[in-house]
């Protein structure tokens, strides 16, 4: 009864007003699954390929009708009649059908949309929540959120070089409480910024995007907001940063234009050592550029013993690149974005490799999101303990937090909220 009888894709809009792919899968039993594919702004060069139309007369070339056609044509013809519960086989068939190393023929956006919608349909068939279907009976760890409350870099039109300034409410007793704490800090920050004469417009991920002069100024405002909300920085609330360093890496140097600094790899490592020494920063994502492996090694050797060093553009949720990084002793954590690799099976494999090698994993959104809340379920399914899904505004971000609240309620007394322990590596 779990045989696939229909797969239908359409072009919808994401949170930035750009087209993306939505896929619906229907099974013989009547079970149904729907998934929408996210899209990034600061994308890694090694990511799977999002298939765009390139027709400048339509959505500025960003249309996804070719990807939609891939789903409604070749992919449906190939998967029709197969059992939706055979996720690994279905994903493998689509990858083989595409026939390229980076999914550029059918499009990672096409393959991922089908992959996630199939999983949702199978969960519906078995009358299980998605996190339980994917993760089994042991899926019960709620993630600590990394909440991006000040946006810079490619996510905002301001001078700040660092892309994301995040708070982690580790002192909460439940996931719902951590979300409440984050919301209180968010509103306290808004007041602090307004009182100082700064604008409180928000960036792509719902965080504020004020015209601040430096990383220090941004961190200073966040520290004051945490205290104004009644919490202790370094105890109740920890800080995390996403540098997206590849975005300002030019000719072997890190060009921090907003701060007027031009640093070599050693200088960039020293920059991070200074910051983590002065603020309760426990996690730095993409602290070095995606292909600066020597720089990454130096950073890991310098602060990796005490700071979570997350590879996003570095690893692009790719099991092969992650395995190489592990063998070279680079970073100690992976950011997990389903659309970077383009299938549920490969995403879960990346998390498995990370966790089995003592690396942490952080489930993540993209800057271009939809109301789809799949990543909330995947965070719980993988027991990864951390999630990055934006600030406390914009419904495309809040949808994930609300789903976590529902999941926690459904788990009842079985739920685990790790708090600070989420940062501990195996």
Swiss-Prot record:
The record's EC number reads 4.2.1.11
- Write out the GO cellular component annotations: cell surface; extracellular region; phosphopyruvate hydratase complex
Q: Does the keyword Cytoplasm apply?
A: yes
Q: Which GO terms describe its molecular function?
A: magnesium ion binding; phosphopyruvate hydratase activity
Top-rank lineage group of the source organism: Bacteria
Q: Which InterPro entries match?
A: Enolase (IPR000941), Enolase-like_C_sf (IPR036849), Enolase-like_N (IPR029017), Enolase_C (IPR020810), Enolase_CS (IPR020809), Enolase_N (IPR020811)
Pfam families (UniProt xref)? Enolase_C, Enolase_N
Binding positions ((2R)-2-phosphoglycerate): 163, 337, 366-367, 388
Record keywords = Cytoplasm, Glycolysis, Lyase, Magnesium, Metal-binding, Secreted
Q: Where in the cell is it found?
A: Cytoplasm; Secreted; Cell surface
Q: What is this protein called?
A: Enolase
Query: Which coenzymes or cofactors are required?
Result: Mg(2+)
Family statement drawn from the similarity comment of this UniProt entry: Belongs to the enolase family.
What are the binding positions for Mg(2+) in this chain?
242, 285, 312
| Involved pathway(s) | Carbohydrate degradation; glycolysis; pyruvate from D-glyceraldehyde 3-phosphate: step 4/5
Q: Which PROSITE patterns match?
A: ENOLASE
Explain the purpose of this protein. Answer: Catalyzes the reversible conversion of 2-phosphoglycerate (2-PG) into phosphoenolpyruvate (PEP). It is essential for the degradation of carbohydrates via glycolysis.
What Gene Ontology terms for biological process does this UniProt record contain?
glycolytic process
- Which reactions fall under this protein's catalytic activity? (2R)-2-phosphoglycerate = phosphoenolpyruvate + H2O
The note describing how and how many cofactors are bound reads: Binds a second Mg(2+) ion via substrate during catalysis.
Per the annotation, which location comes first and is thus the protein's main one?
A: cytoplasm
Provide the active-site residues from the annotation.
Answer: 205, 337
The organism is Rhodospirillum centenum (strain ATCC 51521 / SW)
């Amino acid at each position: 009864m779990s045989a696939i009888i229909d797969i239908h894709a359409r072009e919808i809009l994401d949170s930035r007003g750009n087209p993306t792919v939505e896929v619906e899968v229907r099974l013989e039993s009547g079970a149904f699954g729907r998934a929408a594919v996210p899209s990034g702004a600061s994308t890694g060069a090694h990511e799977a390929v999002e298939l765009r139309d390139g027709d400048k007369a339509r959505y500025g070339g960003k249309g996804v009708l070719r990807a939609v056609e891939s789903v409604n044509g070749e992919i449906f013809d190939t998967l029709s009649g197969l059992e939706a519960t055979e996720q690994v086989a279905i994903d493998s068939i689509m990858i083989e059908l595409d026939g390229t190393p980076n999914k550029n023929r059918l499009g990672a956006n096409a393959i991922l949309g089908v992959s996630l919608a199939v999983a949702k349909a199978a969960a519906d068939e078995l009358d299980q929540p998605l996190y339980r279907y994917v993760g089994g009976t042991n899926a019960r760890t709620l993630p600590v959120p990394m909440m991006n409350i000040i946006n810079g870099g490619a996510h905002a039109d301001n001078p700040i070089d660092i892309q994301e300034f995040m708070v982690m409410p580790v002192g909460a007793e439940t996931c719902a409480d951590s979300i409440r704490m984050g919301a209180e800090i968010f509103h306290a920050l808004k007041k602090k910024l307004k009182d100082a004469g700064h604008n409180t417009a928000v960036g792509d991920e719902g965080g504020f995007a004020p015209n601040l002069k430096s990383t220090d100024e941004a961190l200073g405002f966040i520290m004051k907001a945490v205290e104004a909300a009644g919490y202790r920085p370094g105890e109740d609330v920890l800080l995390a940063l996403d540098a997206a360093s590849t975005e300002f890496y030019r000719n072997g140097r890190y060009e921090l234009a907003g701060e007027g600094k031009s640093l070599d790899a050693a200088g960039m490592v020293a920059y991070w050592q200074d910051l983590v020494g002065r603020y309760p920063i426990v996690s730095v994502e993409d602290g070095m550029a995606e292909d600066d492996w020597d720089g990454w090694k130096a950073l890991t050797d310098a602060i990796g013993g005490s700071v979570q060093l997350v590879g996003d553009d570095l690893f692009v949720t790719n099991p092969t690149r992650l395995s190489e990084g592990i063998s070279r002793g680079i970073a100690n954590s992976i950011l997990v974005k389903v659309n970077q690799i383009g299938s549920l099976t490969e995403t879960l494999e990346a998390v498995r490799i990370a966790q089995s090698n003592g690396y942490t994993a952080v489930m993540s959104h993209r800057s271009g999101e939809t109301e789809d809340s799949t990543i909330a379920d995947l965070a719980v399914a993988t027991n990864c303990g951390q999630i990055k899904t934006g600030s406390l505004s914009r419904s495309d971000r809040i949808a994930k937090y609300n789903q976590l609240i529902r999941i926690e309620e459904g788990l009842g007394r079985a739920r685990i909220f790790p708090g600070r322990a989420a940062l501990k590596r195996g």
